[in-house]
Design a protein with these regions (language model features):
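Long, solvent-exposed, polar/charged low-complexity segments
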Residues: 1-17, 21-23, 41-46, 50, ...
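Aromatic- and glycine-enriched beta-alpha-beta binding-site module
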Residues: 78-138
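A contiguous pocket-lining binding segment that forms or flanks enzyme active sites
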Residues: 116-167
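Short histidine-centered catalytic/ligand-binding loop motif
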Residues: 31-38, 119-120, 128-135, 197, ...
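N-terminal low-complexity, intrinsically disordered segments
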Residues: 59-66, 78-88, 187, 196, ...
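Active-site acidic/histidine clusters and adjacent loop/turn architecture
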Residues: 11-75
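Sequence-level motif detector for i,i+2 pairs with an aromatic at +2
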Residues: 70, 112, 181-183
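Soluble extramembrane domains of integral membrane proteins
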Residues: 39, 63, 68-71, 76-94, ...
């Protein structure tokens, strides 16, 4: 089916889940609503976004293209390493990996819709490679300009970061804010009145993903560890 938006009841489900996140409540009151009001439209949105990415030139710009399509997360939390043992997620997420440590994200929660581009390194060496690129005058200035344009468009540049500064970086470094990052999530949030209950919600995600492309392109070209060539796909060096 064609994606036509999330019903108002989808957001109310997450309000109710925040009030009672128990297995019994899920079985008796939440599960059927989740499948109908959240999961079904998110599956439709994921299919639509997969087609969008496949038909766009994300593949050429990043050296990949998310050939597996947009993946929709399940509702059950992994609580093994968490002090919070509540069993169910308070959001519905979906993601697309473009390259290792680089991808696109969207989620729905009780506040509305959030879409972003993400860099999520798994090792300190990857963070070091990113910081070296930021410290270079040409690459660092380019990233600072990209970040400034995104913030002017209403993006928030979030993600895990140091509270102080990396070792050896002076306190007056012009790009200290960028150098503090250990992960980057550049995204925009949309409330219910932005059109979430219509097909406009899909347009908002596509517009956000398109706007964040310069950041993803910069990461692919300058900050990621080069990947082996596979199936004729050009990988940035």
């Amino acid at each position: 089916m064609t994606f036509s938006g999330f019903p108002p009841s989808a957001l109310r489900l997450y309000e109710d889940l925040a009030a009672d996140n128990s297995k019994e409540a899920w079985r008796l009151r939440h599960r059927e609503r989740y499948e109908r009001d959240v999961r079904a439209p998110m599956d439709e949105l994921a299919a639509e976004l997969s087609t969008y990415v496949k038909e766009s030139d994300f593949r050429e710009s990043t050296g990949s293209g998310g050939s597996g399509g947009v993946q929709v997360l399940g509702p059950v939390r992994d609580t093994r390493m968490s002090h919070d043992k509540s069993p169910y997620k308070t959001y519905q997420g979906a993601y697309l990996d473009l390259l290792p440590c680089l991808g696109l994200w969207v989620h729905l929660d009780r506040h509305g819709l959030y879409a972003s581009g993400r860099w999520y390194p798994y090792a300190g060496a990857e963070v070091a490679r990113y910081r070296a690129a930021v410290e270079q005058e040409d690459g660092g200035a380019e990233l600072a300009a990209i970040a400034g344009r995104l913030e002017a468009q209403g993006f928030v540049l979030g993600g895990d970061r140091l509270r102080s500064r990396p070792r050896g970086v002076p306190a007056d470094h012009p790009r200290l804010g960028l150098l503090r990052h250990r992960k980057i999530d550049a995204g925009r949030r949309y409330g219910p009145d932005a059109g979430l209950h219509t097909a406009r919600a899909g347009e908002l995600v596509r517009e956000t993903w398109q706007a964040v492309r310069p950041l993803l392109d910069w990461m692919a070209a300058r900050a990621l560890t080069p990947q082996p060539r596979e199936r004729g796909v050009d990988v940035p060096s």
